[in-house]
Amino acid sequence: MIDADPTLRPEPLPEDNDRALRPQGLGEFIGQAEARANLRVFIESARRRGEAMDHTLFHGPPGLGKTTLAQIVARELGVNFRMTSGPVLAKAGDLAAILTNLEARDVLFIDEIHRLNPAVEEVLYPAMEDFELDLVIGEGPAARTVRIELQPFTLVGATTRMGLLTTPLRDRFGIPTRLQFYTIDELFEIVSRNARKLGAPADDAGAREIARRARGTPRIAGRLLRRVVDFAVVEGDGTITRELADGALTRLGVDQLGLDGADRRYLRLVAENYGGGPVGIETMSAALSESRDALEEVIEPYLLQQGLIQRTPRGRMLAQKAWTHLGIAPPKSQSDLFG
């Protein structure tokens, strides 16, 4: 099994629910400039017209702020916020219970909307389009359809797997918004602000050191910051410097690129056992005793984004940057390839 460090994975952990660190409005939200600018227009238009905002879909890698933005949309509209997730809505009745309790213009947020039960999804279509709910009462010959009028509402969906959404559902979102990985400068701002809120101010070099290793993801930056704060309080004077951040993150196994032990084992396997590749994903899966899905969804996205590996029709290959990072000279054939 790959021993992936949960601190460096963008999936939510209980410690991420620190409301004090979450931005409360669009003005406080750092990053995603294009998405924020567009949302500001859509929100203001809905407020001036006194109507529900059009249905909105946030998509992109985990940990970039989809849930936070959904909460901000409701707060800026001045309406109630209801939250659920695709796997929780097992039956049409589960969705009906939520929809019938919404007030006018409320925001309903469905996380992991790509995991909706198809039967539930069918019920959602008329609710999104016409604000009506068609429910089947009874069974067999005695079954009948009852139509329930709903208050106009805004559905905000979030997904990390846009390709798994059915076309009919995807087409019903009037405002599709892709969230991008954050730049180091944006993460630097986030880390600096949150360090002050945690009572352990960071100097510029210290905040930037954490930002550089946060894998372009605010959720990961927040986790790394908390761990560095622990070191600053116990082994320092409560201030985060570059030296303290570097020492703490190195002890936590987070290297200069933000890679953990699982990432480095993946790269070393391709380098040392397969000469840099190409090597098939099934072979990688067997060699690392890990499922193909785990490799493709947990390990590889960041390695691809950083230009450390390449996916080719023949399999995975290391890029020149990976050889440099590992401190290993590429084989002669690959050296010629890279020039």
Swiss-Prot record:
It catalyses: ATP + H2O = ADP + phosphate + H(+). ATP binds at L21, R22, G63, K66, T67, T68, E129, D130, F131, R172, Y182, R219. Mg(2+) binds at T67. InterPro entries: AAA+_ATPase, AAA_lid_4, CbxX/CfxQ, DNA_helicase_Holl-junc_RuvB, P-loop_NTPase, RuvB-like_N, RuvB_C, WH-like_DNA-bd_sf. It is an enzyme of class 3 (hydrolase). GO terms for biological process: DNA recombination; DNA repair. Keywords: ATP-binding, Cytoplasm, DNA damage, DNA recombination, DNA repair, DNA-binding, Hydrolase, Nucleotide-binding. Its EC number is 3.6.4.-. One of its GO terms (cellular component) is cytoplasm. One of its GO terms (molecular function) is four-way junction DNA binding. Residues 1-22 are annotated as: Disordered. It comes from the Bacteria. Residues 1-182 are annotated as: Large ATPase domain (RuvB-L). Residues 256-339 are annotated as: Head domain (RuvB-H). It is found in: Cytoplasm. DNA binds at R292, R311, R316. Residues 183-253 are annotated as: Small ATPAse domain (RuvB-S). Its main location: cytoplasm. Has 3 domains, the large (RuvB-L) and small ATPase (RuvB-S) domains and the C-terminal head (RuvB-H) domain. The head domain binds DNA, while the ATPase domains jointly bind ATP, ADP or are empty depending on the state of the subunit in the translocation cycle. During a single DNA translocation step the structure of each domain remains the same, but their relative positions change. Homohexamer. Forms an RuvA(8)-RuvB(12)-Holliday junction (HJ) complex. HJ DNA is sandwiched between 2 RuvA tetramers; dsDNA enters through RuvA and exits via RuvB. An RuvB hexamer assembles on each DNA strand where it exits the tetramer. Each RuvB hexamer is contacted by two RuvA subunits (via domain III) on 2 adjacent RuvB subunits; this complex drives branch migration. In the full resolvosome a probable DNA-RuvA(4)-RuvB(12)-RuvC(2) complex forms which resolves the HJ. The RuvA-RuvB-RuvC complex processes Holliday junction (HJ) DNA during genetic recombination and DNA repair, while the RuvA-RuvB complex plays an important role in the rescue of blocked DNA replication forks via replication fork reversal (RFR). RuvA specifically binds to HJ cruciform DNA, conferring on it an open structure. The RuvB hexamer acts as an ATP-dependent pump, pulling dsDNA into and through the RuvAB complex. RuvB forms 2 homohexamers on either side of HJ DNA bound by 1 or 2 RuvA tetramers; 4 subunits per hexamer contact DNA at a time. PANTHER family: HOLLIDAY JUNCTION BRANCH MIGRATION COMPLEX SUBUNIT RUVB (PTHR42848:SF1), PTHR42848. Belongs to the RuvB family. This is Holliday junction branch migration complex subunit RuvB. It comes from Ruegeria sp. (strain TM1040) (Silicibacter sp.). The gene is ruvB.
